UniProtKB/Swiss-Prot annotation:
It comes from Homo sapiens (Human). It is a lipid-anchor. Interacts with importin subunits KPNA2 and IPO5; this interaction likely mediates the translocation into the nucleus upon oxidative stress. SUPFAM superfamilies: FAD/NAD(P)-binding domain. A lipid is attached at G2 (N-myristoyl glycine). It is an enzyme of class 1 (oxidoreductase). 6-hydroxy-FAD binds at G18, G19, G20, F21, G22, R54, V82, D285. One of its GO terms (molecular function) is oxidoreductase activity, acting on NAD(P)H, quinone or similar compound as acceptor. It holds the Pfam family Pyr_redox_2. The record marks H174 as: 4-hydroxy-2-nonenal adduction. This is Ferroptosis suppressor protein 1. Its cofactor is 6-hydroxy-FAD. The gene is AIFM2.
Length: 373
């Protein structure tokens, strides 16, 4: 797909809604193919959120995790909040009244969740970086820290804190018995638990925080009392929430109401076309495909969507997306980790080499064709 695509002037114009991992992969490919496109995101820079948790504990790391869109995509990037999609007139509607015409649409809106794992705000690059540097200070001030939620974000968060600050007392509270994601091999989930115990993390499993609404999040306090449904009380200085990831459907919910899965993701066919709309593709978290929500999968979806837009214009057969065996790596601080590659267990050495040290930051700078700071 390296060669450029010749199209009739004005016949093809792709709008990509959302500049996460799927969005920048699609935009980079369209740019290389010389296909007219516009990437829209409410931030002015791509957030490499795979490294967001390390940026919350290590001073100076956050600047490596935000990469300017306009430097890479120039006039093919528009900062704005998408408030709706007009399917009849093929327009993406922005807050403030601007309308972006499209012949083809790629929805790559991702998911939302609590800071620091996610950063979902209309923001400048500098303000976003500062938010993480402020978080580092809150962590540094706190002797006792509670992490709520023991999915992949929660276990990685607890490990990052204990790696950077071994003297801090970290308690992880999780409503299930097993840690990390249910799609993972039992042996991987068990090793996650062992790593946390070796690092000295206190685990409260099968307990749910019962006073979450009353708790200040991400802010140091002299004394915070965390209570669970089992009657356990934990005194802490800082509470970090790592649960509640939701599909970000606000941009398209109204236009595609009849095409939504219960999660808010869009129902797609094997070509990643939204049901009933051959010129609209959904990729990444907002596509209802039976795989975990992961950055590298969003990139694979982008390859399919871009190839199929080109193939449809050239009247060639469309490619199908076929999920393979799961690859899932958990970085447990920069020196540790565990996971599985194509369904097979991999230990610390492999995960450390592939993910833990750099958290794929250099890959995103390469995709954006920029040099890291």
């Amino acid at each position: 797909m390296g060669s450029q695509v010749s199209v009739e002037s004005g016949a093809l114009h792709v709008v990509i809604v959302g500049g996460g991992f799927g969005g920048i992969a699609a935009a980079s490919q369209l740019q290389a193919l010389n296909v007219p496109f516009m990437l829209v995101d409410m931030k002015d820079s791509f957030h490499h959120n795979v490294a967001a948790l390390r940026a919350s504990v290590e001073t100076g790391f956050a600047k490596k995790t935000f990469i300017s869109y306009s430097v890479t995509f120039k006039d093919n990037f528009r900062q704005g909040l998408v408030v709706g999609i007009d399917l009849k007139n093929q327009m993406v509607l922005l807050q403030g009244g601007e309308a972006l015409p499209f012949s083809h649409l790629i929805l790559a809106t991702g998911s939302t969740g609590p800071f620091p794992g996610k950063f979902n705000e209309v923001s400048s690059q500098q303000a976003a970086i500062q938010a993480y540097e402020d978080m580092v200070r809150q962590v540094q001030r706190s002797r006792f820290i509670v992490v709520v939620g023991g999915g992949s974000a929660g276990v990685e968060m607890a490990a990052e804190i204990k790696t950077e600050y071994p003297e801090k007392e970290v308690t992880l509270i999780h409503s299930q018995v097993a840690l990390a994601d249910k799609e993972l091999l039992p042996s991987v989930r068990q090793e996650v638990k062992e790593i946390l115990l070796r690092k000295g993390v206190q685990l409260l499993l099968s307990e749910r925080v019962s006073n979450l609404e009353e708790l200040p999040l991400n802010e140091y306090r002299e004394y915070i009392k965390v209570q669970t449904d089992k009657g356990t009380e934990v005194a802490t200085n800082l509470v970090i929430l790592c649960t509640g990831i939701k599909i970000n459907s606000s941009a398209y919910r109204k236009a595609f109401e009849s095409r939504l899965a219960s999660s808010g993701a869009l129902r797609v066919n094997e070509h990643l076309q939204v049901e009933g709309h051959s010129n609209v593709y959904a990729i990444g978290d907002c596509a209802d495909v039976r795989t975990p929500k992961m950055a590298y999968l969003a990139g694979l979806h982008a390859n399919i969507a871009v190839a199929n837009i080109v193939n449809s214009v050239k009247q060639r057969p469309l490619q199908a997306y076929k999920p393979g065996a799961l690859t899932f790596l958990l970085s447990m601080g920069r020196n540790d980790g565990v996971g599985q590659i194509s369904g097979f267990y991999v230990g610390r050495l492999m995960v450390r080499l592939t993910k833990s040290r750099d958290l794929f930051v250099s890959t995103s700078w390469k995709t954006m064709r920029q040099s890291p700071p």
